[in-house]
Design a protein with these regions (language model features):
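Membrane-interface transmembrane helices that cradle and orient dolichyl/undecaprenyl
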Residues: 162-203
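Specific aromatic-rich, kink-prone transmembrane helix
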Residues: 133, 154-176, 357-361
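Intrinsically disordered, polar/acidic, low-complexity terminal segments
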Residues: 6, 17, 23-69, 73-76, ...
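Perimembrane helix-loop-helix junctions
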Residues: 192, 221-252
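Transmembrane-helix signature of polytopic, membrane-embedded enzymes
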Residues: 116, 120-140, 160, 179, ...
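Hydrophobic/aromatic-rich transmembrane helices and adjacent perimembrane loops
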Residues: 147, 155, 343-369
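Aromatic- and kink-enriched transmembrane "portal" helix at the membrane-lumen/periplasm boundary
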Residues: 80, 98, 102, 132-159
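Membrane-interface alpha helices of multi-pass inner-membrane proteins
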Residues: 202-217, 224-228
Length: 587
């Protein structure tokens, strides 16, 4: 009797210790959320608008956007929710600072991280492992672009919404009990899992969340498979369809009405093999985030798949794990299908969703390993600390490099705001074609009038010279007014020139690497460029055919279409780079 009593006492003490450890892990998690947000905001305090998001910013600063344009395809995606966030922040805080936009974006990331922590716990992962892995996800160096490019809300917002929807769907099947480990969760870590049927009463919030997800970007459409698979395992095919059919139907309607141009998008040109390769690269790079080389990522992915197969065979695999894993595959596959040039699956804002969706399986697999090896808790915490520190250090370096690039871009736009005041700049010119390629000089003047871009009192001479040339060179549908002597084609590299009627010449490639053409403007003038085949025309300043430099503009010209390359400053020499196709050049 005394032995039995002693055992009960020991068991009670161990149970209380386990509960204390779980509570401590939860407190540490909430502390990391509270600390990470201001830290992330501070690291990105000097970032600025870049790439496609300028199109949205110009819309809400009076660039001719109509209210219903929020439903138009952005690139090839339905991004109404993200556009509305930009417009709401712009209406409240203006666009002179990037920080308000970044604050909203990082808040979404922090919420997504907390929901991911909930998913890891729901799957039966050890609380300390879940807390450590999510802390690393909070400062995800491999996903720096998703954190510091606000337009990556098209990835972070769908992830948060779909994880929330999946948790609701999974919770409904557990009798609606909240907090702590549920009976099914306790079995998730060690034994067979009971799969109760999903109740219908929580279908409405799942439907609303999935609707918002598909309105937030392409990843949201791909992630519909996650609640669908949870519903399939919890309530069968009918329940799965009922959860995602409204969102899928609304997306199909939008595709038919507003997104018809997407149906003509070229997509990937290399067929199914390119899609499979893109998916494989994305998954292995996601797994390699914490391990280093891609080879280790491939090995880890194979081990994870084998572990999932063993658990599934034993009916001990929580439904959220295969659902999220299939969601990761779907995200990379849809991304590959939507990119005309194939793209790079290891781009950081693509990896963000892949890492987040593979983390539930990785967390439970690591939990199984730790329990099997009986690793001391101190060793586990030390290892997780190294992972978090490594991820945070990578993020700090990437944020610093990003800030440098953004500030360089901003300085060029501010210089254009000052130099364009004399009225000689071409409206269609592009002062900063690398990160600000969507901003024309006319846009700069509009932003200056609205005090979004305030011209500096003094300019660096080198910056002034560079911007002065750029704002006087443009590719447009109209010829520059007052054009003088016709520009002369002075040389070609990588191609051949042949005469054509009306004093024109045809420039054609002599290899698969494209060609460059040098054009000299003795006076202000315009060169007529007509595409013989689909052509991406890139215009450079002060370059040579062998080494063009200082890109000024680029435009895609369709077959039979034509553009004018205008130069307003006498003595300008331009280099036209044509990666593919042939062009007809006329004065």
């Amino acid at each position: 009797m005394q032995v039995r009593t002693a055992r009960r006492v020991v068991a009670g003490v161990e149970a209380r210790r386990a509960i204390d450890h779980e509570r401590l892990a939860a407190r540490v998690h909430y502390a990391t959320l509270l600390l990470a947000y201001p830290l992330l905001l501070w690291l990105g305090r000097s970032t600025f608008f870049r790439h496609d998001e300028w199109r949205i910013v110009l819309g809400h600063t009076g660039a001719g956007s109509q209210p219903w344009d929020v439903f138009a395809p952005f690139d090839i995606h339905w991004s109404t929710a993200v556009v509305l966030i930009y417009r709401a922040v712009g209406a409240v805080a203006g666009s002179s600072s990037y920080l308000p936009y970044l604050g909203v974006s990082l808040a979404v990331h922090v919420v997504a991280s907390h929901l991911l922590w909930r998913v890891l716990l729901r799957c039966g992962a050890d609380r300390w492992i879940a807390t450590g892995l999510v802390a690393a996800f909070l400062v995800l160096g491999a996903g720096w672009e998703a954190l510091y490019w606000v337009l990556s809300l098209t990835s972070t917002l769908p992830l948060a919404l779909v994880l929330f929807a999946a948790l609701i769907a999974d919770r409904a099947a557990r009798g609606g009990r909240a907090g702590g480990l549920q009976p099914a969760e306790e079995g998730a870590g060690r034994g067979r899992i009971c799969l109760p049927r999903l109740g219908a009463r929580l279908s409405a919030p799942v439907t609303m969340l999935t609707l918002l997800a598909v309105m937030s970007g392409g990843p949201g459409v791909a992630m519909l498979v996650i609640p669908a698979l949870v519903g399939l395992q919890r309530g069968g095919p009918r329940r799965a369809v009922s959860l995602v059919a409204p969102a899928a139907g609304v997306y199909a309607l939008w595709l038919a009405l507003a997104g018809s141009a997407i149906l003509h998008h070229p997509g990937t040109t290399s067929g199914g093999g390119a899609v499979v390769g893109f998916v494989w690269d994305g998954l292995t790079a996601s797994m390699a985030t914490l391990l280093g080389p891609m080879g280790l990522g491939a090995a880890a992915l194979f081990v994870l798949c084998a572990w999932m197969a063993v658990r599934a065979h034993a009916r001990a695999l929580p439904p959220l794990i295969p659902a999220c894993a299939v969601g990761a595959v779907a995200v990379f596959a849809l991304t590959a299908l939507g990119r005309g040039n194939g793209g790079d699956a290891t781009t950081s804002h693509y990896l963000y969703a892949g890492i987040g969706l593979l983390l539930p399986g990785a967390a439970l697999a690591l939990t199984d390993l730790v329990r099997r090896l009986r690793l001391p808790r101190t060793a586990l915490l030390a290892g997780l600390g190294v992972v978090v520190a490594h991820s945070g250090a990578m993020l700090a370096l990437d944020a610093d490099a990003l800030t440098h690039d953004d500030q360089a871009s901003r300085s060029l736009l501010l210089a254009a705001a000052r130099l364009s005041q004399d009225g000689t700049a071409l409206p269609d010119s592009v002062p900063e074609p690398i990160l600000g390629w969507a901003v024309s000089t006319a846009d700069v003047e509009r932003l200056r009038a609205q005090d979004v871009l305030v011209p500096p009192a003094a300019l660096d001479p080198a910056v002034a010279a560079e911007v002065s040339l750029r704002i006087h060179v443009a590719v447009s549908a109209t010829r520059i007014a007052g054009a003088g002597e016709a520009p002369q084609v002075s040389g070609i590299d990588g191609g051949t020139l042949s005469t054509a009627p009306a004093g024109c010449v045809v420039a054609a490639p002599s290899s698969a690497n494209g060609f460059t053409v040098s054009v000299a403007y003795a006076q202000a003038g315009a060169l007529h460029v007509e595409a013989v085949t689909p052509t991406l025309l890139q215009v450079y300043l002060r370059g040579t055919p062998q080494a063009p430099a200082d890109e000024a503009a680029k435009v895609l010209i369709a077959p039979g279409d034509a553009q004018w390359v205008d130069a307003a400053l006498p003595g300008t020499t331009l280099v036209l780079r044509v990666p593919t196709g042939s062009v007809r050049l006329c004065s």
